[in-house]
A protein has these predicted regions:
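Core nucleotide-handling region used for phosphoryl-transfer chemistry
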Residues: 2-518
Length: 518
């Protein structure tokens, strides 16, 4: 068994990796703090603890770290010191401080009082130095130090070895830039999701999205949308001469719809039904089972990870918004979906009286919404049955032509916003290919207000809300994948909402391995 590995529910956006510390940049107003970058993530470090070239472990922002690891390294904050390995020592210091408080409540001279206060404060300060800064939930959150954002957590091999001694034997170079979420067979890190507020729903638990389709024997072929990985961790996949499409990442809720083959039950004789029950119950003579269905094309739709058609998924409820926004969106496009065609899109605006994403109206009035298709797949016309993945520009052209032919859809269907189509070498000609091209191009994109409006307000919204970010896809990519780059201002706002315990449907659906969503 590998000491560092990936679990079945591994998510690249919420994991750990071994990295080499890059350039340390001074931070104005501080003699001992410095800024470095892990991919696109800014992180603040102490110059006396972290040096350029060090090999360290990095935990992504908004992760939840293993409680035993935090305890072994005394990383829980003073408010939950009982979770730390040195809890007894900290308790003794706090009790000593409390005894000073008791003495202060008695009659004492001014000199004695000052001495007791100093002694009390020393005990409290010492107790605090023996604790960390993680809250009880072990969440890695974005903070600002000297106005510099710090996203993620760096820790050493020695720290991890306190939790898992076997780590002492690994060669860090062998794992450089490798992602993992499991240490020696135990889940070490996962996405942090605050306690979910109750919504009207019913149904079962999530597993991997595409695996869940198998439970619905009426669907013959269906694919949920793949996870969009972080560009920072995949920038090495992009070559300077790759033709890429960079589009606006909008903040809504996912919808998947397609006209796919489904099995529709048909009536058969009683004795045939009886025989089929025997076959199904005992799992024998499967080849002699009577056919009790017809195969037809039907429109099926889902959220990011849950089939929504009630005749297929009988346990599905109205969902997070108490209103089937996914059906409403599908009804708009259903008449124009061809056989074996699947459309992946984003729904933005309002679900009746509820904003789909708080603060992100995208120009919609209350009760209004629109669908933005961003991905389409069909079958190749060579008879092979192979899936054909459309390029982003083809998706945009299809949407624009649809609206042109059916102008009544103009308010309900919006084409994807493409910021750039071409090579990154042409976009950033001043970035030398021979000198750390990937790292430097990533930095250019992170700060590109001219082409992408990074860190700016989203002009599509009436409210003052920051742009979420951008999505990059390689044209004619043999792999179905896309990469996202989120704005720091958006991430900071998202972190503030998580602090309040506000969880949107995308977070529930995408990051709760065992969450529910109907």
């Amino acid at each position: 068994m590998k000491i560092l590995s990936k679990s079945e529910n591994f998510k690249q956006e919420y994991c750990c990796s071994i990295i080499k510390v890059g350039t340390l940049k001074p931070i104005e107003g501080s003699d001992f703090l410095a800024q470095t970058f892990i991919g696109d993530a800014s992180i603040v470090v102490r110059k006396d603890q972290v040096k350029e070239g060090d090999l360290m472990f990095y935990a992504s922002n908004e992760c939840q770290l293993n409680e035993k690891f935090l305890s072994a390294n005394n990383l829980f904050e003073i408010g939950c010191y009982e979770k730390n390995g040195n809890a007894k020592e900290v308790k003794e210091l706090l009790e000593a401080a409390e005894r000073c408080e008791v003495e202060l409540s008695k009659d004492c001279t001014e000199e004695e009082g000052e001495s007791l206060r100093n002694e009390r404060d020393e005990y409290k300060a010492k107790a605090k130095t023996k604790c960390g800064f993680f809250s009880y939930n072990g969440r890695v959150r974005m903070i600002r130090l000297k106005k510099t954002p710090s996203m993620g957590y760096l820790f050493s091999k020695e720290e991890l070895a306190k939790y898992c001694p076997k780590v002492k034997d690994i060669n860090m170079e062998d794992y450089l830039n490798i992602d993992f979420d499991t240490v020696d067979g135990e889940l070490f890190v996962k996405a942090y999701v605050p306690p979910v507020k109750e919504h009207s729903r019913r149904g079962g638990k999530h597993n991997k999205r595409d695996k869940k389709v198998k439970q619905f024997d009426r669907i013959i072929e269906w694919s949920f949308h793949y996870d969009t990985d972080m560009l920072a961790k995949n920038i090495w996949k992009i070559r300077p001469d790759d033709v890429v499409t960079i589009s606006n990442k909008i903040h809504g809720t996912s919808v998947v719809m397609g006209k796919v083959k489904t099995r529709n039950p048909k009536k058969i004789a009683f004795y045939k039904r009886l025989w089929n029950n025997v076959v199904d119950t005992f799992g024998i003579f499967k080849n002699s089972r009577f056919i009790d269905y017809t195969v037809d094309y039907d429109v099926v739709y889902s959220s990011r990870g849950v089939i929504k058609n009630q005749y297929i998924n009988e346990n599905v409820g109205p969902g997070y918004y108490k209103f089937d926004i996914w059906k409403e969106a599908t009804d708009i496009l259903a008449p124009y979906i061809e056989e074996d065609m699947m459309i992946y899109g984003e729904i933005c605006g309002w679900a009746e009286k509820t904003q789909i994403q708080k603060g992100y109206d995208y120009g919609c009035k209350q009760g209004e919404f629109f669908v933005m298709p961003y991905r389409i797949t069909t079958k190749k016309k060579d008879g092979s049955g192979t899936k054909y993945e459309w390029n982003v520009d083809e998706v945009r052209q299809w949407t624009e032509n649809l609206v042109k032919e059916h102008p009544e859809l103009a308010e309900k269907v919006h084409p994807i916003t493409i910021f750039y189509h071409g090579t990154l070498a042409d976009l950033y000609p001043n970035v030398k290919v021979s000198e750390h091209w990937h790292e430097n191009v990533l930095q250019e994109m992170m700060n590109d207000k001219e082409h992408f409006g990074m860190e700016e307000l989203e002009p599509m919204c009436k409210n003052k809300s920051y742009r979420e970010g951008i999505v990059l896809r390689i044209d004619d990519d043999p792999f179905a994948e896309a990469f996202k780059l989120k704005c720091k201002n958006f991430l900071q706002k998202e972190a503030a909402l998580i602090d309040k315990g506000e969880v949107d449907i995308e977070m529930q659906d995408a990051y709760c391995n065992n969450g529910e969503e109907n």
